[in-house]
Amino acid sequence: MICYNQQSTEPPTTKTCSEGQCYKKTWSDHRGTIIERGCACPNVKPGVKISCCSSDKCR
């Protein structure tokens, strides 16, 4: 499966992932809203939104 794997401040990149899922985490700090994408579906801290999916480049 192919997932995006970059933060919102970087140009889009992809990675082949064996985990079978992609994620998109979103949170806010002093820099504004931050978006991070990657492989798997990790647990997140309170205040961090996460959405996971299981198709190529889905998040």
Curated annotation (Swiss-Prot):
It comes from the Eukaryota. Expressed by the venom gland. GO terms for cellular component: extracellular region. Transmembrane segments: none annotated. Disulfide bonds join 3-22, 17-39, 41-52, 53-58. It is found in: Secreted. Its main location: secreted. The keyword Cell cycle does not apply. Gene3D superfamilies: CD59 (2.10.60.10). Keywords: Acetylcholine receptor inhibiting toxin, Disulfide bond, Ion channel impairing toxin, Neurotoxin, Postsynaptic neurotoxin, Secreted, Toxin. GO terms for molecular function: acetylcholine receptor inhibitor activity; ion channel regulator activity; toxin activity. Pfam families: Toxin_cobra-type. SUPFAM superfamilies: Snake toxin-like. GO terms for biological process: modulation of receptor activity in another organism. Belongs to the three-finger toxin family. Short-chain subfamily. Type I alpha-neurotoxin sub-subfamily. Produces peripheral paralysis by blocking neuromuscular transmission at the postsynaptic site. Binds to and inhibits the endogenous nicotinic acetylcholine receptors (nAChR) in human rhabdomyosarcoma TE 671 cell line with an IC(50) of 48.2 mM. This neurotoxin is lethal to mice by intraperitoneal injection and to zebrafish by injection at the back of the dorsolateral region. This is Three-finger toxin MS1. It comes from Micrurus surinamensis.
